[in-house]
Regions:
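N-terminal loops that bind phosphate or other acidic moieties
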Residues: 1-130
Length: 130
């Protein structure tokens, strides 16, 4: 099974390189900058986990930004949601509302790639199907 990387204004290709470098199959990369279209839910149902992300994770994420919507749809579909963000300003309760499994901070391509690698290692031990 594959992983879905759905990022808003972050470099999804860099995250994908990190995931692949750690040994995961090539992920399905979805550009969420313009919101979620009709294909998103079908793509979500075809993966074992989703990585959402945006430049800043905060209370506005819960109140309507696309990363919050990705997390809600993932929870509704029974798909674990992880986040890679530029800055994490969301309190633990907010993360629980979104049911985020991991939250990693990264800025720039090199850090995004490294975050992808760290997340892949966690996924391979936590949620990777046999």
């Amino acid at each position: 099974m594959r992983l879905l990387v759905a990022l808003d204004r972050l470099d999804g290709a860099a995250v994908a390189r990190g995931l692949i470098a750690a040994g995961l199959p090539s992920p399905d990369v979805y550009d969420a900058a313009d919101g979620l279209d009709a294909t998103f839910d079908a793509r979500l149902r075809a993966v074992f986990a989703v990585v959402a992300g945006e430049p800043r994770l905060d209370r506005d994420t819960i109140d309507g930004r696309v990363t919050g919507e990705i997390a809600v749809r993932a929870r509704q579909a029974g798909v674990p949601c992880h986040a890679i963000v530029g800055t994490d300003r969301l309190d633990p309760f907010g993360k629980r509302i979104l049911d985020l499994q991991h939250v990693l901070q990264a800025r720039g391509a090199a850090q995004l790639e490294a975050a992808g690698t760290r997340l892949a290692r966690a996924l391979m031990t936590d949620v990777m199907p046999d």
